[in-house]
Amino acid sequence: MAGTVLVTGATGTLGREVVRLLVARGVAVRALSRRARSGGDGVEWVVGDLVTGAGIAGAVAGVEVVVDCATTVGRKDVAAVRTLVAEAGKAGVRHLLYVSIVGVDRVPIPYYRAKLACERVVRESGLGWTVLRATQFHDLLLRIFDASARLPVFPVPGGARIQPVDVGEVAARVAELAGEGPAGYAPEVGGPRVRPYRELAEAYLRAAGRRRVLLPVRVPGTVGRALRAGGNLTPERAVGRGTFEEALAKRFGGH
């Protein structure tokens, strides 16, 4: 891969793995952070804020590929992508790779709607583009379960299924795509198995050595129907290999 790659969201769960893998491939990596960071890790750290636009023009200057792993909440997410696209266009960026989520076009929750709007901005940017959708990371599911375990009862969305994937596997695919040309919508990346939410919650509680009453909760309306219909899943793209049990073992050891 020739030229510099800018990674946004470089300190996040996915972004830091992408940065690490690109550096290991010998790629010149520029990483965007809202706070100043020291180098020494083979990375050129730059300060910028996608929401305000501060520092973004400088961040994209001289860059061939932008990998957007950043996430903000709601409308700010869309505004951030618009800012990135505008500055990347001015700088002559060759390829913009945007990481999204499986089901953003099927599950009508606000966060997913914002992601879908971001995809549209990328598609209409005039830049060469790739969008990669992935299912939920093990890390996200663990954070949700950590929060649920602090409640008197553990809520379980009735009928919901999850296809969690290892973030390292998604990062590896992102790093590959960054070295290729614009691909439009790339094949999705899903975890190895589609599993009931309840089954994953039970596995978490066993691994954590916790006891909680699991409380079935019916998710109402169109969101509930979309989840029960598997709108958040991509069973035909179950290409991940790392299991949720392996993530639990890494987190809790032999507990």
Place the predicted regions along the sequence by residue.
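Conserved beta-loop-beta element that borders a ligand/cofactor-binding pocket
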Residues: S100, A117-L140
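N-terminal Rossmann NAD(P)H-binding glycine-rich loop of SDR-like oxidoreductase domains
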Residues: A2-V27, S33
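Short-chain dehydrogenase/reductase
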Residues: T8, G74, V78, P108-L116, ...
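NAD(P)-cofactor binding segment of oxidoreductase domains
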Residues: E44-V46, L50-L96, R113-E124
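N-terminal Rossmann-fold cofactor-binding loop
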Residues: A31-R37, D49-V51
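Mid/C-terminal beta-alpha module of Rossmann-like enzyme folds, strongest
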Residues: A2-T4, T13, G168-H255
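A conserved pocket-lining segment of Rossmann-fold NAD(P)-dependent short-chain dehydrogenase/reductase
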Residues: T130, R143-V165, E169
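SDR active-site strand-loop-helix element
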Residues: T8, L32, C69-A70, L96-I101, ...
